[in-house]
Amino acid sequence: MVPGRRTRLNLTDRSTRILGMDKRTDTRQRLIDSARDLIYARSYSDVGVQEICDRAGVRKGSFYHFFPSKRDLTLAVLDQFQAFFRQEILGRAFADNLPPLQRIDRFFDYAADFQRQMKQDTGQMPGCPFGNIACEMSTQDEAIRLRVEQIMQDAEVPFEQALAEAVADGDLPGIDAAETARALFAYVEGVMVYAKTRNEPELVRQLGKRALQLVVPDRLT
């Protein structure tokens, strides 16, 4: 990479399929897909409505037919990311075919695999889309902040359920499952930022192995 030159992710067709979102002919969906790719690759502020329209092959007037503002389009993008995250990461990681604590370990494995694949396709680890936009927009746009807050709270639920099961099974000492799940997800977001900064997806897996030791120091062995 040349010093001082801005690196831009290029979300290819393959990356789009990894996200579970094939390109569609529907105009509204094309706008969502284009905004998703551009904002995830760069940032909310760095992407304008005209660029989104150009990528989608849509006239600007059509944009405002579907979305009153870039904020409204971004909320739709967040909803689409959440649907993918629920199904492809959380849903698979927390399937009950493993003991509850192993599901948490598997979450970090799946998250690392996704980030590694994105890096292979784009050259950069993009990080967590929710954490990315939270860092950028939480002090600037309350509607976006609230949506990301809701998404993150929703993501804590399978962690809480797994922890509660582990307590019931005697694999963990008595803990506040909800509070511990919140701490775990905060750790997830910190790991994602650190791994993104290092551009090393494998750090997500490596640091994930420490997660339960940090939030439950007296974890039974």
Located regions from the model:
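Hydrophobic alpha-helical bundle segments that form small-molecule/ligand-binding pockets
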Residues: 3, 140-144, 152-180, 216-221
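N-terminal intrinsically disordered/low-complexity leader segments
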Residues: 1-26, 221
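Amphipathic C-terminal alpha-helical segment
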Residues: 114-118, 135, 140, 165, ...
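Amphipathic alpha-helical packing segments from all-alpha helical-bundle domains
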Residues: 102-109, 125-127, 132, 142-167, ...
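Hydrophobic alpha-helical segments that form the core
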Residues: 126-132, 175-194, 210-213
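Hydrophobic alpha-helical connector segments
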Residues: 76, 90-126, 181-184
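Helix-turn-helix
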Residues: 30, 38-80
